[in-house]
Amino acid sequence: MPYLREQESVANVNEAQITGDEKLVLAQLIVSAAPLFYALLPCSEQKMLTLVAEQIGEPDTELQNTYVLRHGGRVSSILSAVGDNQITTARLRGSMKLIRKLGRSERACFMSNLKRYAKELEPIDKPGTYIARLATKPASNTAGAGARLLKWFLLSSGPGLYTCHVHKDNSIAMWLNQKVGFRLISELNEGAFDYRALVLQR
């Protein structure tokens, strides 16, 4: 497959053999892709990772379609995406599933945090296929695994509208997405939102 290197392969988690230890690695990668979001969860790191691991490949969540890039059999990078303009629904249902696993006081705190967080996302009217998570293990950052996985996903998915959010201070993620063709939805909202919306029409 174009963009992948020798000894690299990509699989959907729902079709791959994922061990318990790998689920934890994937959960850690997913958290690293959106650390400020998962920091909203008022619970221990271990519980947070367990909750995230439970949602990997789970329908009606942001992680429903999660792809794993392996190099020599070892997890190198992950990408999660939600198609058909369903990101708002997936985000809501995924959050509700998290809320149900929290205690009463934790729920109130998390819901309050979510409302504040939602205001920091630049609006996207037509999300198309939304790239919800993209992360690479630190040891393989220089190998460009994340960029290759993103290119693989775009090529495999075919023509269409793709969107994502990138934190305004995450210059590496902003550069990576713009390198493969994403652009800011609006140049007018600079400074208005912590998370900038990007779009790619293929």
Language-model regions, residue ranges each:
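Conserved N-terminal entry element of GNAT/NAT acetyltransferase domains
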Residues: 1-24
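Conserved acyl-donor/pantetheine-binding loop and adjacent beta-alpha core of acyl/acetyltransferases
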Residues: 85-129
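Conserved beta-strand in the GNAT
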Residues: 68, 74-83, 130, 135
